[in-house]
Amino acid sequence: MSAAICAGVLLASGTAARGDAGAVSWQAPTPAPGSVVGVAAGTKVTVQLAAASAVRTATIRIAPASKLPQGARLSVTPGNPARAELSWIPRGAQVGTHPLRFNAVDISAVPVSSQALSFQARVAPGTVKLSGLENVSRWAFVRRQMIVRAAPRASAYGKARLKAWTPEYYPNPVLALQERIDRNGTWVQVRLPILPNNSTGWVKRGALGDFRITRDHLVVDRAATRATLFRNGVAIFTTRVGVGTSYWPTPRGEFYITEKMSGFHNVAYGPIAFGTSARSAVLTDWPGGGYVGIHGTNAPRLIPGHVSHGCVRLRNASIVRLARLMGVGTPLTIH
C-alpha cells in the first residue's frame, strides 16, 4: 500500500495499522507506521491520511500528535472515515529527516478511542533544471554585482564577477541552467560570458531578477554559413551568414543573446546588432574586441562566407527580420 503523494516518494512502506473491531484504525492511503516519505527541497509533497471505525455512528478526527514542520499544513475532514491532507514545500534549510506523528480519535466514543501513527519525511537537496526541457529556457537580469562561485555555496571558489550592466551599458542577463535548494540556500547555475567559453557558475537566487521564459533557440552552423532560429523546436527563420576566418574563428559552444542594439554610427554593423555571451581569444568585429556579436553589414556581397573577425554577419534585411523574432536571453548554439 502506498501513500498518495505528489512530487514525493514513499521510500519505505507497509500496511497501515488496524485496530480491533470497533476501534479506530488507519485506512488506505495512509502511510504505514515507520515508513519514510521522500521529497526534494523546494518541491511540494502531499500525503493523504484516512481513519475509520466499525461503529457506524462514530465521528473520527485526525490531528497532529506533535508540532508539524515549519510551513506544513494539515487540512482535516472529520467523519467516518475521517480524512486529512498534509501539504508541505520544504525549504533548503529543512533538508534532513522530520518525524510526523498523528492521532485518529473517535470523539463520539466514551471513553475516547484513538489510534496513533508515526512516520517520517526525509527532505533531500533539490535540483531543478531551468533550461533545455521541452524547448523552454529561463533567463534573468543581474540585479547587482556579484561573485560567481564554482559550487552552490558561499565558501566555493570565485570564478568570475558579474555586473548588473553589460560593457555597452545595457541590463546584463544570464541564462539560468538549474536551481539548487539545500541548507546553503537557493543557488542558480548560470552560463557565463567569460573565457574559456561554455563556462558556468553558481550565484545566489536573490542576486537575479525574476525568471523570464523563452522558447526560441538560435543555431549558427559555421560550415554551412547558415543561421536558423527555432521556436518550440520548429525552424521559423533561416538565412546565410558570414562567420570568422580561420585566423579569427567564430567560437563554438553554447551561449546566449545578451543585448539588442541599434543606431550605430559605424555602418559596418548595419541597422541592428545583438550582443552574445560568446568570447574570442583573439579578436572580433565587436567594439573593444573579444566579444562575438551578431550584426548587419555594409558589405552584403561578402555573405555567405568566412569573412569576419569572429562575429556573425547577416545582410541588413535579414538582421532586421531576426530582430523582430528574437530577444534577449535566447540560447545560442554555434557549431
Feature locations, PLM:
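Short, solvent-exposed loop/turn segments at the edges of extracellular beta-sandwich modules
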Residues: V105-P111
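Boundary regions of SH3-family modules and the immediately adjacent low-complexity/disordered segments
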Residues: G126-N135, R191-V220
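Beta-loop motif signature
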Residues: G126-Q178
